[in-house]
Amino acid sequence: MPDPSGFLPSQDGLAFTNAWPSEPAVVLPTPFGKINIGNAAAGLCGGMVFAALDFWHTGIQPPATRPAPGEPLYRYIVQRLVDSWHLPAGVAQYYQWMNLPDGDSGFEAFGRRVVTDRGLAWRTIQTQWPQIAADLDQGTPAALGVVTVASASPADLGFNHQVLAYGYDASPSEVTVLVYDPNSGQNDGIYIRFDPRTPTEPTTFAHNINISHPVRGFFRTAYAPVPPPAS
């Protein structure tokens, strides 16, 4: 399966998984009030995705040892976690998508379907996926926000996830996106797979990401490289 970016989790992913000791919570000031996105024990997925991509951009091999809380690498990953939420727009996008249906909403009028709102399938397949594929075709991995819950509660924002797309295989009936999942470590076999033919309807996003929730949709996040700390 093509990996046009040249990124591989087995060589470019962080050598440790997204499992951390209990530490004081990371709290984000959002349009919905302050949101607790962890205690680090709940995971630093976005920080690990951004960190791996930072190391890849600089051509530096990521450290092989998990940092202890308080060490420069740990503080850097936590800061990149905050960056990955792209305040306030990024948090607002997660929240908006959490409150959208899986398929399009609308009604029948004069024998025609009138769409009142696009669902997550359409937004993922028609809007986000072409941008992600364009990044990959140009050799650049794409950081993804993965929406996993349907909820109007801002407290549930932390149930969403982040991964890094680095390759894909596409046919008219099936798209398989290769992703680096911090929860799965340096595993080259992690994917998200979907049928792009009916984006107006609820679509199954099959996956083997190491999370307990389904994938409802995903979008390209606002990533900008930051030099990682010196080892």
Stretch-by-stretch model annotation:
Residues 1:
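Non-catalytic, low-structured ubiquitin/UBL-interacting segments
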Residues 4, 33, 38, 132, ...:
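Short, flexible coil/linker segments at or flanking structured domains
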Residues 6-126:
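Cysteine-nucleophile protease catalytic domains, especially the papain-like/related folds used
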Residues 19, 48, 147, 180-182:
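Structured loops at beta-to-helix junctions and adjacent beta-edge loops in soluble globular domains
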Residues 22, 51-56, 150, 169-172, ...:
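Short loop/turn segments at secondary-structure transitions that flank enzyme active sites
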Residues 121-179:
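Active-site-adjacent substructure of cysteine-protease-like catalytic cores
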Residues 156-160, 169-231:
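Cys-His-centered catalytic/binding microenvironment captured across papain-like cysteine peptidases
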